[in-house]
From Swiss-Prot:
Mg(2+) binds at T26. Monomer. Residues 10-204 form the tr-type G domain. It comes from Shewanella sp. (strain MR-7). Residues 174-176 are annotated as: G5. Belongs to the TRAFAC class translation factor GTPase superfamily. Classic translation factor GTPase family. EF-Tu/EF-1A subfamily. Residues 136-139 are annotated as: G4. This is Elongation factor Tu 2. The gene is tuf2. The lineage of its organism: Bacteria, Pseudomonadati, Pseudomonadota, Gammaproteobacteria, Alteromonadales. GTP hydrolase that promotes the GTP-dependent binding of aminoacyl-tRNA to the A-site of ribosomes during protein biosynthesis.
Length: 394
């Protein structure tokens, strides 16, 4: 069967549902799918199709996630929903499903619960830029004052984690009633969709960001100079552009004198392409795998950062035993392993396989990094954890 052609005529935005267990994330996902399909066209997905999330592997970690798509008049959305709390933690830390914005689902019958807080904290740590709140099960609360209290509580909680709690959209609705086709509650789903359209800005495309290419290999071509190869992560590099070589050693500047792809000479290399870049006056020994080539000033090398880490369970092929402070694994960034030491939060003595934890990492040599960069933790080439740079310290 031929796949439907992917129409790229609308901006594409990635979103997802987050929130406490049983607050109605999957029901809301189904309600959005149904109401928007009914209103704007498209295919509706049922609760059971979404809830039966297929198992995926991302960097060796088993994650269950459901992906659905829907349209509003101006945008195309890809929406991710996870069945279990552990799946959310893994998903957000590995960046398996990068979110341009999240819909925080809070049952108005319960108010914010422990996982509500944890998902907000994770969103802050992994750099989810925007949150919209959907207060669910409002059909079960008769008291308008109670709804107001829950809304205040959620807004305060978001402000506590540096989200603009006072200004972000909060929609009071009932996912189940909307799914059952009751017009007053369907209207709330449309209101939510309008909030997604207006509150989450259109994401910047990779190609519009400053140029960056992780260096995978280095060759010297006699009579031409040194060529570095890799896949362009973002931006565009053109022949004649000044570039920096960042990470591991002192940052140096050079000029791109040629771009090659599949043995053909090109004028430029773009995000997503594997290419070779010829560097002016750079010696073979001046560059190595693990460094990055970037637009001057766009990224800096760092050694110390706060991170949010998920430690693989034994079943996922991770460690069988906990680790303690003083643990010195390798941290794999983009194309290379760098040894580092860890500092655990106060009062935490050990970390068990299957845990997620905030830790401060100090690398033995600097690596080009931004907040939001993903990494793997490895021991002798085997992945034992996944993490994300939450905050750069030095």
């Amino acid at each position: 069967m031929a796949k439907a052609k992917f129409e790229r005529n609308k901006p594409h935005v990635n979103v997802g549902t987050i929130g406490h267990v049983d607050h109605g994330k999957t029901t809301l996902t189904a309600a959005i799918s149904h109401v928007l399909a009914k209103t704007y066209g498209g295919e509706a997905k049922d609760f059971s199709q979404i809830d039966n999330a297929p198992e995926e592997r991302e960097r060796g970690i088993t994650i269950n996630t459901s992906h659905i798509e829907y349209d509003t008049p101006t945008r195309h959305y890809a929406h991710v929903d996870c069945p279990g709390h552990a799946d959310y933690v893994k998903n957000m830390i590995t960046g398996a499903a990068q979110m341009d914005g999240a819909i925080l689902v809070v049952a108005s019958t319960d108010g914010p619960m422990p996982q509500t807080r944890e998902h907000i904290l994770l969103s802050r740590q992994v750099g989810v830029p925007f949150i919209i709140v959907f207060m669910n099960k409002c059909d079960m609360v008769d008291d308008a004052e109670l709804l107001e209290l829950v809304e205040m509580e959620v807004r305060e909680l978001l402000s506590e984690y540096d989200f603009p709690g006072d200004d972000l959209p909060v929609i009071q609705g009932s996912a189940l009633k909307a799914l059952e086709g009751e017009p007053e509650w369907e209207a709330k789903i449309i209101e939510l969709a309008e909030a997604l359209d207006s509150y989450i800005p259109e994401p910047e495309r990779d190609i519009d960001k400053p140029f960056l290419m992780p260096i995978e290999d280095v060759f010297s071509i006699s009579g031409r100079g040194t060529v570095v190869t890799g896949r362009v992560e973002r931006g565009i590099v053109r022949v004649g552009d000044e570039v920096e070589i960042v990470g591991i050693r002192t940052t140096t500047k050079t000029t791109c004198t040629g771009v090659e792809m599949f043995r053909k000479l090109l004028d430029e290399g773009r995000a997503g392409e594997n290419c070779g870049i010829l560097l002016r006056g750079t010696k073979r020994d001046d560059v190595e795998r693990g460094q990055v080539l970037s637009k001057p000033g766009s990224i800096n090398p760092h050694t110390t950062f706060e991170s949010e880490v998920y430690v693989l369970s034994k079943e996922e092929g991770g460690r069988h035993t906990p680790f303690f402070k003083g643990y010195r694994p390798q941290f794999y960034f983009r194309t290379t392993d760098v040894t580092g030491t860890i500092e655990l939060p106060e009062g935490v003595e050990m970390v068990m396989p299957g845990d997620n934890i905030k830790m401060v990492v100090t690398l033995i040599c600097p690596i080009a990094m931004d907040e939001g960069l993903r990494f793997a933790i490895r021991e002798g080439g085997r992945t034992v954890g996944a993490g994300v740079v939450a905050k750069i310290i030095a």
